[in-house]
Swiss-Prot record:
Core subunit of the mitochondrial membrane respiratory chain NADH dehydrogenase (Complex I) that is believed to belong to the minimal assembly required for catalysis. Complex I functions in the transfer of electrons from NADH to the respiratory chain. The immediate electron acceptor for the enzyme is believed to be ubiquinone. The chain crosses the membrane at residues 4-24, 29-49, 63-83. GO terms for biological process: ATP synthesis coupled electron transport. It catalyses: a ubiquinone + NADH + 5 H(+)(in) = a ubiquinol + NAD(+) + 4 H(+)(out). The keyword Transport applies. It comes from Anopheles quadrimaculatus (Common malaria mosquito). GO terms for cellular component: mitochondrial membrane; NADH dehydrogenase complex. This is NADH-ubiquinone oxidoreductase chain 4L. Signal peptide: none annotated. Coiled coil: none annotated. It comes from the Eukaryota. Gene3D superfamilies: 1.10.287.3510. The lineage of its organism: Eukaryota, Metazoa, Ecdysozoa, Arthropoda, Hexapoda.
Length: 99
């Protein structure tokens, strides 16, 4: 029982560290995507232990992982298209107002 709460706290601390890195490191798109994936991994760990603790089925974790993979693929496709058009992945060279 205490081990389960330790895992809950560990996943929450991982999520908070991921949020801190996401907010503080805004220079490159790749580092931002990596911090987002770290946050998703910590949420998956929290979800896994929560579902095990409550004796629920693991079907929702499959859907969660599927959407996380889709999010990662979309982020990488944006990164590749940004590098092709601008030559780098700096946020300073990318403007949303440009077409």
């Amino acid at each position: 029982m205490a081990n389960m709460f330790l895992m809950f706290y560990l996943s929450m601390i991982m999520f908070l560290f991921g949020c801190m890195v996401f907010v503080s490191n805004r220079k490159h798109l790749l580092s931002t995507l990596l911090s987002l994936e770290y946050m998703v991994l910590s949420l998956f760990i929290f979800l896994f232990f929560y579902l095990n603790f409550m004796n629920y089925e693991m079907y929702f974790s499959m859907f969660f992982l599927t959407f996380c993979v889709c999010e990662g693929v979309l982020g990488l496709s944006i990164l590749v298209s940004m590098i092709r058009t601008h030559g780098n992945d700096y946020f300073q060279s990318f403007s949303i107002l440009q077409c």
